[in-house]
Structures are given as C-alpha cells and as structure tokens.
Amino acid sequence: MLTKDLSITFCGVKFPNPFCLSSSPVGNCYEMCAKAYDTGWGGVVFKTIGFFIANEVSPRFDHLVKEDTGFIGFKNMEQIAEHPLEENLAALRRLKEDYPDKVLIASIMGENEQQWEELARLVQEAGADMIECNFSCPQMTSHAMGSDVGQSPELVEKYCRAVKRGSTLPMLAKMTPNIGDMCEVALAAKRGGADGIAAINTVKSITNIDLNQKIGMPIVNGKSSISGYSGKAVKPIALRFIQQMRTHPELRDFPISGIGGIETWEDAAEFLLLGAATLQVTTGIMQYGYRIVEDMASGLSHYLADQGFDSLQEMVGLANNNIVPAEDLDRSYIVYPRINLDKCVGCGRCYISCYDGGHQAMEWSEKTRTPHCNTEKCVGCLLCGHVCPVGCIELGEVKFKKGEKEHPVTL
C-alpha cells in the first residue's frame, strides 16, 4: 500500500505516478501496454512509429555480465515498430479508449519535415496525450533517422517546428547520448518548440566478441554491428547528462523525462533528485517483467514519507546544488577507513586491492587473517571499502592535511 501520492504534473499532463514504459519492445502493441497499465505503470511511451517499416535482424540482443550477477548491460539491434502505421494508430486509439486515466505518449520518427508534421497530426487524432520525438535511435538503417539526426541541432530544431505545426500536444525531444554536449541539442529542441526533453536513449556499443569466430555479438549470419547499449551500466551516463541540462541557465526549468538503467526505487529517486520528473524503463522490464513497478512505487512512496516530502515535485532537482565543479571540492582532509572486524570474513580483498591498485596502506596479518590500515600511507581513497564483499569497511576518522584549518565536514 502506498503511503504517499505519487502523482505529478509533467508538461501540463497529470501522471498518476512517474513510472512509464519507454519507447521499445516492452510497449510494442495494445496487449503489452494494457498489461503494463493494469500492473500499475502511470504512463506508456508506445514503441516509435513512422512511415518507415523496420526489417529486423535475428538474433538482435546481447548482454554484459559481471561475475555471477544478472546482466548489467544490454545491447539491442531493434529499430522502430515493425507493425504498419495504421495498426499502430489503431492500438493508440484503443488504449486511450480503454485507459482514459492513464498517460499515453506517442513516440514518432520521420525522415523529413513533411513526415514529422503528418505523424504528429495522426497521433493526436488517435488520442495520444503527448508526443515524443525520437531523434536518437542509434541503429536505424536510414541515415535520415535516429541518432544521426539527434547529433544535429539544426535538424532537431527544424523537426521540432514541423511537429508543432502538425499538433498542439505537449512534445518531448528524445536525446542521444552519443554526443559531447547534450545541452546544445536540447536548446535547439527548445527553440523549435519542444516542451521538454527525454534523456537518454541507448549508447552506441559493441558488447562482446565471439573469440572463436572473431565476430561481434549478436551474430547475424557471420556479421554484427554497432548498436544501442542500455541497462544499469548506463545509469551514470544518464544522470550526468540530466544534471548538466538541469543546471544549464537556459534549461534549468525545462522538464525532463529520465531514462537509463532505472530498475529500483533507489534508481528512481536518484533521477528525480537530479531533475527528472517522470521516469522511463525498458531493460529492467525485459529482465524482471512489468511487476517491478510495484516495488518501485512502494519504495518511492515510503522514501517520500521518510524524508518528509508532501509531494513528488518537492524532491525534483534537490541534489543539483550539491554537485559542483571538481575544482570547488574540499581537498583539505583525508578520511581513513574504519574496519569492523566483527563483520570481516578474512577474505583479503581489501589488502590485495590496496597493494596492487592503491597505496599499499592496508596491512595484513596472516596469523589472524585480518586487515589493518597504516595511516602513514593511507590517502583516504576508500578503494578498500568498495571491494569489500561484506561491507565491513566504513568511513572513519577525518584528518586535516598539514596547514589546513579544521572545520565541520559532512560525510
């Protein structure tokens, strides 16, 4: 049971909660989107539609693992919806008729101004609440579409204007992360009439190489291709782009729908605290199913209550004041590790990592199989705490560097 109301108004549209399917295979037809709504998702971004009919490869997925974990990163070679345009429009109409209180976002992609304008008109007539312009799919076979467009501020601005000519609906521009400065493109979208930003789409990648056949994965008749990477591994990239946009003077109040590695309520809270107001998910659903929204909503609701927030909007962007340029960070002190020997299992990983990858400050007793920090050598990097498998190494004593004035420190 939710302890707090998770509704939020985004670009003038009220969402029952911030959790949405992102434009992808998880929202490819009426049946899938209906199940998502029934499970508790607040909105759906229907898989990108256009006049272009995708001819897909098989297989089309790959994944990246770390030791014995589930996959941490996911590669896909899918393009836009493979169904005919009329079939997709019919699905949009039916979804809005059957779920009038849920938010339906139509993702569109054209190859020229005329197509963008016409698609905008068609999805508004079909009942969509919002439009998301996909300027960022990294594996389109047409260079007039996808991330090639999203890297050009001029094209993004031009196509946003075309969409605004075709529709009066709120419109998001979906950003590609395959670019150095996302703010430049976001500003172009704003000039073109976009009401907000969706970020990020997938990262261009090669995930694995088959070492026997010397071919990238997945293998399609002896070949492979660069394509989009998603999942938990891209979350830091997404958070960085969102933070940079929300702290840009001309984008500070520009609404953002956050995408990239969200699969827990903690992930959701991080995106919200950096300035996203709605949240889109694909890879987490592909791995765990639509049901993950139940835990995400419950956890986020309890977090709001614990933190004393009355509404979701109150927490949006709060963390940005605490992210500063590297040159502004306090470099006057060292934090030494504190080792809880009651929890220590004597594995020695802290010692090995510090010796081979740090500053040889962690000493090791073969007799007791316990570590000890030599503060004469320790620089306070806390690598030891990050590699500890049982969490027995914590932040400990704060020591100010020679010549520095002592002052309160927040850890």
UniProtKB/Swiss-Prot annotation:
Keywords: 4Fe-4S, Iron, Iron-sulfur, Metal-binding, NAD, Oxidoreductase, Repeat. The active site is at 137 (nucleophile). Induction: Transcriptionally regulated by IscS. Disulfide bonds: none annotated. Signal peptide: none annotated. It catalyses: 5,6-dihydrouracil + NAD(+) = uracil + NADH + H(+); 5,6-dihydrothymine + NAD(+) = thymine + NADH + H(+). Its cofactor is [4Fe-4S] cluster. [4Fe-4S] cluster 2 binds at residues 354, 378, 381, 384. InterPro entries: 4Fe4S_Fe-S-bd, 4Fe4S_Fe_S_CS, Aldolase_TIM, Dihydroorotate_DH_cat. It is an enzyme of class 1 (oxidoreductase). Substrate binds at residues 76, 134-136, 201-202. Heterotetramer of 2 PreA and 2 PreT subunits. Belongs to the dihydropyrimidine dehydrogenase family. Involved in pyrimidine base degradation. Catalyzes physiologically the reduction of uracil to 5,6-dihydrouracil (DHU) by using NADH as a specific cosubstrate. It also catalyzes the reverse reaction and the reduction of thymine to 5,6-dihydrothymine (DHT). This is NAD-dependent dihydropyrimidine dehydrogenase subunit PreA. It comes from Escherichia coli (strain K12).
